[in-house]
Structure formats: structure tokens, C-alpha cells
């Protein structure tokens, strides 16, 4: 008598999300990843950000010098290339030292040989985003003669990226823990930690006061800014916005501040500090990011939406100067009844940054009017490096 057999998935089997996370971890540690498309084409890819001269030479030798550098459409435009799908630059005759110049250098030499990117390159760039690496890829198509060198590398089907993205937008975030925390000038608050999304990062919701969940809840969706929030950088107004938002939530009778792990508009702290270097020589915040291959704003708000839903919040008053943020939350199903502007201090160091956010990112802020109506502080503690900081109205309505 034959015993029927049943195929059961392994209880600790892999999923599309797990495979994407593993691929991101491999790139971040300087290892190649093998990408496979629907036609069974195979590409080996590495992130330039985590490569060394030695690993570059090893990769080039393994693929028989068929490797190329892929640059995003944004960086390609910086190079003067009309490449809406990004650009592949052949590397057979180029040295490792020349890669950084093509990928990051301001005003580099325009490459003469290049080809449009394709779906493989877009997928590889998405993995670098998950890994918080700069979006410059060294890649090569593989053949039966070259693929053996990558036999032990993480393999990722391009369909996994689509599946993982779909899961991230539908899978609820886990509430890990919550506890009361007394805050200076704000009284008792509650810190609520969520975990979810690709990479399972922890995100924090801070409950101020006792908001009425039956009406539109005041909410600030705040992206982390180490330099501004913690160290008081004068290059941005993030720290002011954070503190003024918390004060506004208290004044409105209570609300929620979502503190998201999205340093540098989603690009990561390393990319942000690199971009600061370009700002130091005169580029604005958007052009500085473009030098590195990033678009104006790489943030995604899936996590914020999931956290709000977990808290039972679907209608909000959004504390933000950014109309695009409100629209993206609306597109995800959150009802934004009102947008309340959040205004910080204008300094000599951040005025250009704020004007760029208005002129190029569409933020709703009348900087000239705010400067004209502000009162200069009399407290000598408001002087920084001999320069008087100009405080302005802390809240207002758009």
C-alpha cells in the first residue's frame, strides 16, 4: 500500500520580502547579488557604494570585462545624458578610480559611450534604496561560462521586488511596545513602537495628550533628522519643526507625532552628509541629492499609514508645509481634513534651504513675509557665532 505524499512548505521557508532583505544586506556588505528576470536572463550586480578596488577587480575578472556602471536617470541628467531609463556605461577600459568620478563627482567628464538601462538596472537600484546605499550599480550579464563564479551569491527574481512592495503596502505593522514618558514642557506622553515593512525597522508614534479619535486628529509625520533634531543644525529647520509640532499638538488638545526612520529624505545618513558637502560648495538641497543620483524626495509613507490605522486614526489634521505629503497620505486612504503649517526659525544658514523647498519642492511658506513680520530676539542666548537668529511665528494655517 502506497502512502500518499503531500508537499508542505518549509515552516521557515523564504518569502519575497525576506529574499529582498537578504539581497539588500548582501549589497551593503559588498557582495554581489544575482538577478533573474522573466526570460531567465541573469545579471550579477554590486553596489558601487560598498565596493573596493579589490572587489571591483575580482568582479571584472569574473565577468570577463563585460561589466558596466549603471547610473540613475537623475545622475545621467547631471552628466548631460538624455537617459530617461538611466545609463549603462561600459567599464572594460575604465579604472576603479574613474567610477566615483562618473557616479558622484560634480561636473564630471561626459561619457561618450553609453546605452539605456533596463528593468534589471531599475531592480538593482531599488535594492540599493532598501540598503540605504547610493544608487550607482556595477553589473554584468552572465553566461554559462561566467555564472559559476556567483554560485554562492543571493539570487533574486525580479518578481520578488513587486511582491515585496505589494506586501509592504498591505501588511499591518506590529505594535511592539508602548509606555508613558514624561516630556519637558509637554507633560505626560506615550511612546508607541511599531515594527514592519521591508527590513522590519522600528518606527515610533508619540501620543501627546488625549486626542479625540472621533474627529480629525492633529498629526505630524516627521522624518528623522539627526543633525537638526538632536544637534541643532542651522542648515535646516527640522529640529524647530519637531519641537514646534509637539507644542502645537499640546495646544490643540492632543495629537500624534509619527517619528519615521527616513533620514535624509529617505536616502540615509551617509548620503545626507555627502549631500551636505555639495551644499557647502553652493548647490541647493535638491541639486546636491541629484549629484548622488537621488530624486527630490525618495520617502515613502506606507509605514505612516499603517501606524495611523493601527492607532484607529483615519481622519487627520496634518501639521506640514508640504502639500505633496498631504496628497500622498490621501492617496493611501487617509482623510486629510486640514493642513496646518509648521514654521521654525530662519537663519542665514537655512534661508536658502527653505527657499529651495518653496520654489522647487512646492512647500507652502511665505518666507519674505515671515521675515518681515518677525521680531529679532533680545536674549543674547539667541546669538549663534555672532549672528542673530530671526524667530518667526511658530504656527499658522495654510
Swiss-Prot record:
The record's region (Unknown) falls at 1-172
Task: Please name the CDD domains in this protein's record.
Answer: GTP_cyclohydro2
Q: Name one Pfam family in it.
A: GTP_cyclohydro2
Name the chemical reaction catalysed here.
GTP + 4 H2O = 2,5-diamino-6-hydroxy-4-(5-phosphoribosylamino)-pyrimidine + formate + 2 phosphate + 3 H(+)
Q: Which cofactor does it need?
A: Zn(2+)
Quick one: which gene encodes this?
A: ribA
UniProt-annotated stretches for the region Disordered: 375-398
Native organism: Xylella fastidiosa (strain Temecula1 / ATCC 700964)
User: For binding Zn(2+), which residues are annotated in this chain's numbering?
Assistant: 225, 236, 238
Lineage runs:
Bacteria, Pseudomonadati, Pseudomonadota, Gammaproteobacteria, Lysobacterales
InterPro entries the record matches: GTP_cyclohydro_II, RibA, RibA-like_sf
The note describing how and how many cofactors are bound reads: Binds 1 zinc ion per subunit.
Q: What is this protein called?
A: GTP cyclohydrolase-2
Its biological function?
Answer: Catalyzes the conversion of GTP to 2,5-diamino-6-ribosylamino-4(3H)-pyrimidinone 5'-phosphate (DARP), formate and pyrophosphate.
This protein's GO CC annotations: cytosol
- The EC number of this protein is 3.5.4.25
Task: Specify whether Phosphoprotein is a keyword of the entry.
Answer: no
The Gene Ontology biological process annotation of the record reads:
riboflavin biosynthetic process
Q: Name one GO molecular function term.
A: zinc ion binding
Asked if ATP-binding is a keyword of the record, the answer is no
Keywords (A to Z) from UniProt: GTP-binding, Hydrolase, Metal-binding, Nucleotide-binding, Riboflavin biosynthesis, Zinc
- For region GTP cyclohydrolase II, the annotated ranges are 173-398
Name the protein family: In the C-terminal section; belongs to the GTP cyclohydrolase II family.
Per the record, the domain of life is Bacteria
Q: Which residues bind GTP?
A: 220-224, 241, 263-265, 285, 320, 325
Q: In which pathway does it act?
A: Cofactor biosynthesis; riboflavin biosynthesis; 5-amino-6-(D-ribitylamino)uracil from GTP: step 1/4
Amino acid at each position: 500500500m502506497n502512502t500518499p505524499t503531500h508537499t508542505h512548505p518549509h515552516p521557515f521557508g523564504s518569502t519575497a520580502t525576506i529574499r529582498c532583505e537578504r539581497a539588500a544586506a548582501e549589497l551593503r556588505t559588498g557582495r554581489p547579488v544575482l538577478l533573474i528576470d522573466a526570460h531567465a536572463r541573469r545579471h550579477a550586480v554590486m553596489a558601487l557604494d560598498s565596493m573596493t578596488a579589490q572587489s571591483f577587480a575580482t568582479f571584472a575578472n569574473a565577468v570577463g570585462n563585460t561589466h558596466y556602471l549603471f547610473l540613475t536617470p537623475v545622475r545621467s541628467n547631471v552628466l548631460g545624458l538624455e537617459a530617461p531609463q538611466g545609463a549603462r556605461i561600459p567599464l572594460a577600459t575604465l579604472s576603479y578610480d574613474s567610477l566615483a568620478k562618473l557616479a558622484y563627482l560634480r561636473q564630471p567628464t561626459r561619457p561618450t559611450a553609453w546605452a539605456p538601462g533596463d528593468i534589471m538596472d531599475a531592480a538593482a537600484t531599488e535594492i540599493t534604496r532598501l540598503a540605504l546605499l547610493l544608487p550607482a550599480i556595477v553589473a554584468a550579464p552572465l553566461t554559462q561560462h561566467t555564472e559559476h563564479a556567483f554560485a554562492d551569491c543571493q539570487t533574486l527574481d525580479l518578481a520578488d521586488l513587486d511582491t515585496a512592495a505589494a506586501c509592504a503596502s498591505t501588511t499591518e505593522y506590529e505594535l511592539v511596545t508602548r509606555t508613558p514618558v514624561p516630556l519637558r514642557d509637554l507633560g505626560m506622553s506615550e511612546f508607541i513602537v511599531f515594527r514592519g515593512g521591508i527590513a522590519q525597522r522600528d518606527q515610533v508614534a508619540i501620543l501627546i495628550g488625549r486626542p479625540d479619535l472621533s474627529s480629525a486628529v492633529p498629526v505630524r509625520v516627521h522624518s528623522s533628522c539627526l543633525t537638526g533634531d538632536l544637534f541643532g543644525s542651522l542648515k535646516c529647520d527640522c529640529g524647530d519643526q519637531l519641537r514646534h509640532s509637539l507644542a502645537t499638538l499640546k495646544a490643540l488638545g492632543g495629537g500624534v507625532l509619527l517619528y519615521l526612520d527616513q533620514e535624509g529624505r529617505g536616502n540615509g545618513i551617509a548620503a545626507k552628509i555627502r549631500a551636505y558637502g555639495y551644499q557647502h560648495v553652493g548647490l541647493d538641497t535638491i541639486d546636491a541629492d541629484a549629484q548622488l543620483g537621488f530624486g527630490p524626495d525618495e520617502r515613502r509613507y506606507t509605514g505612516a499609514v499603517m501606524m495611523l490605522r493601527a492607532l484607529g486614526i483615519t481622519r487627520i489634521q496634518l501639521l506640514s508645509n508640504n502639500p505633496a505629503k498631504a496628497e500622498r497620505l490621501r492617496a493611501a486612504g487617509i482623510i486629510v481634513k486640514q493642513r496646518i503649517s509648521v514654521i521654525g526659525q530662519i537663519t542665514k544658514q537655512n534661508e536658502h534651504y527653505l527657499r529651495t523647498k518653496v520654489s522647487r519642492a512646492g512647500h507652502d511658506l511665505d518666507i519674505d513675509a515671515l521675515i518681515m513680520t518677525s521680531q529679532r530676539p533680545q536674549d543674547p542666548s539667541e546669538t549663534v557665532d555672532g549672528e542673530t537668529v530671526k524667530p518667526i511665528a511658530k504656527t499658522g494655517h495654510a
